[in-house]
Amino acid sequence: MTPWLLFGAGGKGVGARTLELALAEQRPVVAVIRHADAATKQAQQGVQVFTGDACDASVVAAACRAAGPDAFIISTMGGAQDYLAHRTVIDEAEKAGISRMILVTSLGCGDSWPFLSERAKAAFGQAVREKTLAESWLQTSQLDYAILRPGGLLDGAATGKAQRIQNQECHGFVNRADVAAHIHELANAPALNQQVYSLIEPDLKPA
């Protein structure tokens, strides 16, 4: 079974739900975790953990070596250093011979920026721009990739109704568990083919 190398799985978001799917099928998992308490918890679950920041090339390189060249990278990271962290991950992946990666960003990134409202741009536009830079670095790398741009994230159970949409404006919400399910599906596909998807559940509304 192909090992997964996870970035951003230390909290309670999409990354954590993706990790749950991997552990449920006893998949080998390597993860870079920033916080020691989360690292300890995951190590107890059987994850091979590297504690440190994804901006630290030495930590990322060690994780890439441990995962091996056949590993599949999945990143759900965010934060103020989003671009620099992903640049480090992508660069070290190339050096290690890892060739496949799924990057989770958000609606509004890249060519979907014009569809973001002015209110949204004012509220979290800086984060979206960071994510856009990360997308660009991946798209100009040697990796086979898929980029998932989920809509507003909710905490409900997976419904199986989320849709991947390409080349059109879309708005909406999606459950974190459904994002993880789509990550799992893509990670098991024969190839990713450098695709970018928006991901929403059309009729889903916040409770």
Regions picked out by a protein language model, each given a short descriptive name:
Residues 78-163:
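Glycine-/Pro-rich loop/turn segments that contact NAD(P) or position catalytic residues
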